Amino acid sequence: MESPRLIWIPTGVASSNLRYLAGHETAHQWFYGLVGDDQATEPFTDEAVADFVARNVLGLKRASRCSTGRLDLSIYSYSATCYYEVIYIQGGNLLDTARQQMGSTAFWAALKGWADANRYRIATTKSLLDALDAATPIDLGKTLFAPRFPRLY
């Protein structure tokens, strides 16, 4: 669970998950603590980014166990079974696809620029996607984001 400057990991967590959980919750220090969002209506903005950063740093890859879903819905719109799979895993994988298509240098520069521009503010998913899209000549909005975020495109 994220909280500024503090990571909460409950007892009983499998030791094989500790590295990922510590990485994910540390990423929340930037993507929730530094750049806020509306976690209920736009969970992608911090959960998918935190998942992506943790998995990227640790070199972890994972496919989702749920069918491909929309990433622009509120937490209340997903089943309990697929919320984590869609928002965290599919969302993180979508960001990794954006990184691969843009190139790592452009991706990380865009993410840093977005974080700097939204420091201590409430950011939106659309502002994040727009920052990534603006950092590449590839039309990510049309080719990658629109199918998963129809409410925003």
Feature names for model-found ranges:
Residues 15, 76-82, 115:
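Active-site-adjacent structural elements in folded domains
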Residues 1-3, 58-63, 118-124, 153:
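Secretory-pathway/luminal and periplasmic proteins that interact with or process carbohydrate-rich
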Residues 4-7, 12, 41-74, 138-144:
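Post-HExxH zinc-binding segment in Zn-dependent metallohydrolases
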